[in-house]
Amino acid sequence: GTMMTGCIEGSPLYRVAWFFADLTEGSFIAALPASIGMIIMGFVAAALERKKSAHAGTGVAGNGHIFTTMFVTTCLSLILGQLLYGGLFASGWIPTFATVLTVQVFVIFYGSDLKKVATSLILGTIVTCPVCYALLYGIVSPLGLPLFIAVSAGVAIVVPVCSLIFRLMPWMTIPAPAEGANPTDQNKSKFFVHQIFGDIGQLTIWGSSWATIGMYVGGIISWVMNPLHPAYGSGNFPLLIM
């Protein structure tokens, strides 16, 4: 499409568009307004979770205390992925989105200490993209399988492999779990509805009901402006959110 052509040509505008699309690619929306809505509401949810507000919904799955670090690290991984592997755009695809699923998990698991975050960012980004790319062209494409299998299988390989490597690094210790928001403080019926939205984005959008709602609102705005913008130009966005 137009975005891929622009990325191949090295257009900064389309590279930025690709960056934002990566943030909601896990939900198959991959649209700028959807990503912006998700980001805004993700920060709102994190703030409400930290305050233990009854309106927090699912918060950000108990990670409000490190949410800013999670988000910044995720963004840096997407930028680093483009810098390292941008030459692969010419092949028609680059799996930068996969680092959203790996680097973010490492930050949640190992904590927000600067040295740990830097290690998670660098190793996670360097390893994830090549593994997913190799799976795509070595197995997925030859067998005619859906592209997303390369990402999901790649993540399933990268997370345990990197975790084993981290064991060799003395500073990559696992911190004691922090206290998260208590869902019993909320109205049970309201929390049930929030949990449905939270489950949709359990891995890619922080398990946050508010972030998911923000993503859907942004996606709808994008679809109204151009029905072929969200959902990879398939025109199936209404079916995707139903």
Where are these regions (language model features)?
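Short, Lys/Arg-enriched, Gly/Pro-containing loop segments at transmembrane-helix junctions
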Residues: 171-182
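Pore-lining transmembrane helices
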Residues: 1-169, 186-242
